[in-house]
Amino acid sequence: MRSEILASAFLGLAVRSIISLYSYSGFDSPPMHGDYEAQRHWQEITVNLAVGEWYTNSSNNDLQYWGLDYPPLTAYHSYLVGRIGASIDPRFVELHKSRGFESKEHKRFMRATVVSADVLIYLPAMLLLAYSLDKAFRSDDKLFLFTLVAAYPGQTLIDNGHFQYNNISLGFAAVAIAAILRRRFYAAAFFFTLALNYKQMELYHSLPFFAFLLGECVSQKSFASFIAEISRIAAVVLGTFAILWVPWLGSLQAVLQVLHRLFPVARGVFEDKVANVWCAVNVVWKLKKHISNDQMALVCIACTLIASLPTNVLLFRRRTNVGFLLALFNTSLAFFLFSFQVHEKTILLTALPALFLLKCWPDEMILFLEVTVFSMLPLLARDELLVPAVVATVAFHLIFKCFDSKSKLSNEYPLKYIANISQILMISVVVASLTVPAPTKYPDLWPLIISVTSCGHFFLFFLWGNVQQFSSKLS
């Protein structure tokens, strides 16, 4: 089994290395470039400026040009990578002069930093979670799960293609999930706090962790035990936050400035054509014309909480392993569909529990994971990553078919037809978008069709996930 696991890991690394050869976000596209330049610029800022200046606008730190808008752990990571880059070539992070810097050597360095995070954090974390699931369920599915995780094109195309470090926050979150399954609650609190302090979008996973851990505390045999347990978990969370935020804790204004950067209400409810409810509604009813940003933020918070509460209340009352994974799936999907300032890439947060729910619902989850890649195609097409996206998705589906003994499609005809219709629809839209030019009057027609189609799928999966959590014997 170890040799097969190792082979799957090398398969995943090979796919990542191949995708790394392709273009990235903002290549040769001045003046703003893209996410690649954002990551490079954060290295420039953190290496050259004092810690207290990282989130503050100044002549040396123009926040309008890719200002740092992720939590402190991302900033520390940028500093580390920037220091390594500066030792290779100081031009990589030279203050002001390195803006928009591009070279073959720099691309190799930046790509290597993402693959290093895959090797050191993401893949080991996913393997730990696969082993933890096997232990929790007394099964032997780790090769099936880990192979599909390693081959999942969504994370690979965004991190190793488009260019981000989702692998780090997702890796920490995976370790936290594994800790929950192993009933190591202090470790779960610690690693989830790390994930949240790397990317604030990990809030998508926060309610299930809160509900599960609070439920465990409430279930203690005495009030004294409850106080002791909740105090220890709170100490882990607050202590980790304090250590990571210590450079800013001396000033309330400094803390508020960081929070302002992390939650920028002024940007609007969504950017581009993201596959969530608000983008779909905006097709027929222009939100910005009728609702202010502040009002829309409150609407989003209310809708997200209403959509998330049932699954988490049930998890609080009935804490099972499958129920926890379903709560992560349902809650993160509710956040994606209804929350404020959603990006295409944040669907990866729902893909994380979906990859491990393949264990229980392989056919449903493989379709969902394919839709996640489909929903990001406009973004990937802009980065000239459409070819690797299609090839990687087909390969992912074929790898799943190699484990076809787990499939139920052969004897569940409604599910088979639904899956076939969805796949034909997605293929047809992709082919049409490549062969039929959008009308001049509607240049974003195809991205909009992709986002609305994906949103419809995601909403149905959200309903399905809640039905499963409330009715399935597994949960």
Swiss-Prot record:
Question: Which cellular component, as a GO term, is one annotated location?
Answer: endoplasmic reticulum membrane
Which EC number applies?
Answer: 2.4.1.267
One GO BP: chitin-based cuticle development
In Pfam terms, one family for this protein is Alg6_Alg8
Q: Does the keyword Transmembrane helix apply?
A: yes
- What reaction(s) does this enzyme catalyze? an alpha-D-Man-(1->2)-alpha-D-Man-(1->2)-alpha-D-Man-(1->3)-[alpha-D-Man-(1->2)-alpha-D-Man-(1->3)-[alpha-D-Man-(1->2)-alpha-D-Man-(1->6)]-alpha-D-Man-(1->6)]-beta-D-Man-(1->4)-beta-D-GlcNAc-(1->4)-alpha-D-GlcNAc-diphospho-di-trans,poly-cis-dolichol + a di-trans,poly-cis-dolichyl beta-D-glucosyl phosphate = an alpha-D-Glc-(1->3)-alpha-D-Man-(1->2)-alpha-D-Man-(1->2)-alpha-D-Man-(1->3)-[alpha-D-Man-(1->2)-alpha-D-Man-(1->3)-[alpha-D-Man-(1->2)-alpha-D-Man-(1->6)]-alpha-D-Man-(1->6)]-beta-D-Man-(1->4)-beta-D-GlcNAc-(1->4)-alpha-D-GlcNAc-diphospho-di-trans,poly-cis-dolichol + a di-trans,poly-cis-dolichyl phosphate + H(+)
Question: How is it placed in the membrane, per its record?
Answer: Multi-pass membrane protein
Loss of this gene results in the following:
Larval lethality. Larvae lacking maternal gny present patterning and morphological defects, including the failure to form a normal head skeleton, a discontinuous cuticle and irregular body contours. Larvae lacking maternal and zygotic gny show severe reduction in cuticle deposition and a complete failure of denticle formation and melanization.
Q: Which InterPro entries match?
A: Glyco_trans_ALG6/ALG8
Specify where it is mainly localized. endoplasmic reticulum
Q: Which GO terms describe its molecular function?
A: dolichyl pyrophosphate Man9GlcNAc2 alpha-1,3-glucosyltransferase activity; glucosyltransferase activity
Q: In which pathway does it act?
A: Protein modification; protein glycosylation
Which spans are transmembrane here? 114-133, 161-181, 235-255, 296-316, 322-342, 385-405, 418-438, 441-461
Q: Where in the cell is it found?
A: Endoplasmic reticulum membrane
Keyword set for this entry? Endoplasmic reticulum, Glycosyltransferase, Membrane, Transferase, Transmembrane, Transmembrane helix
Keyword Glycosyltransferase in annotation: yes
Q: What class of enzyme is it?
A: transferase
Query: Hey, which family's this protein in?
Result: Belongs to the ALG6/ALG8 glucosyltransferase family.
Known role = Adds the first glucose residue to the lipid-linked oligosaccharide precursor for N-linked glycosylation. Transfers glucose from dolichyl phosphate glucose (Dol-P-Glc) onto the lipid-linked oligosaccharide Man(9)GlcNAc(2)-PP-Dol. Involved in cuticle differentiation.
User: Could you identify this protein by its name?
Assistant: Probable dolichyl pyrophosphate Man9GlcNAc2 alpha-1,3-glucosyltransferase
This chain's source organism reads: Drosophila melanogaster (Fruit fly)
